[in-house]
Swiss-Prot record:
Keywords: Cytoplasm, Endonuclease, Hydrolase, Metal-binding, Nuclease, Ribosome biogenesis, rRNA processing, Zinc. GO terms for cellular component: cytoplasm. It comes from Shewanella denitrificans (strain OS217 / ATCC BAA-1090 / DSM 15013). GO terms for molecular function: metalloendopeptidase activity; RNA endonuclease activity; zinc ion binding. Belongs to the endoribonuclease YbeY family. Its cofactor is Zn(2+). Zn(2+) binds at H114, H118, H124. It comes from the Bacteria. The gene is ybeY. It is found in: Cytoplasm. Single strand-specific metallo-endoribonuclease involved in late-stage 70S ribosome quality control and in maturation of the 3' terminus of the 16S rRNA. Pfam families: YbeY. Its main location: cytoplasm. This is Endoribonuclease YbeY.
Length: 153
């Protein structure tokens, strides 16, 4: 069964190195796999200031971060295909890829997959959950032809 995906890509930043809409759709489909028949989500690409503000307001951390996930919680009794929103800071993703000596496209794929897994309920606060999430991320990333994102470059 093929996933019916409605992806709203919002670009609130100037950059000439952004992946294409098709890239984002591929990465979202990879992350969601066969878990859903229909999915709606928004990916918003932002500047440092917006990322920092959201990270401060929602996580109490006064610094920008690579990806923030905002899962949608439907009211009881309502079945909606809306997964939620991902907010990705372009400058942080680009800087991390450079610092970690990773291809930019591979790091973008990792951040989108990582964020989507959060929308599906995965987390990495507890060590066991972190291992499960990282293992799944690695499997999905390698399935796209990229290297293990957690292996030191």
């Amino acid at each position: 069964m093929s996933l019916s995906l409605d992806l709203d890509l919002q670009i609130a930043v100037d950059s000439n190195q952004l992946p294409s809409q098709a890239d984002f759709e591929t990465w979202v489909r990879t992350a969601l796999g066969n878990t859903l028949d229909t999915a709606e989500l928004t990916i918003r690409l932002v500047e440092i200031a917006e990322s920092q503000s959201l990270n401060h307001d929602y996580r109490g951390k006064d610094k920008p971060t690579n990806v923030l996930s905002f899962p949608f919680e439907a009211p009881p009794g309502m079945e909606l295909p809306l997964l939620g929103d991902l907010v990705i800071c372009v400058a942080v993703v680009e800087q991390e890829a450079l610092e970690q000596n990773k291809p930019l496209q591979a790091h973008w794929a990792h951040m989108v997959i990582h964020g989507c897994l959060h929308l599906l309920g995965y987390d990495h606060i507890i060590d066991q959950e972190a291992e499960e999430m990282e293992s799944l991320e690695t499997q999905l990333i390698e399935g796209l032809g990229f290297s293990n994102p957690y292996k030191e470059a």
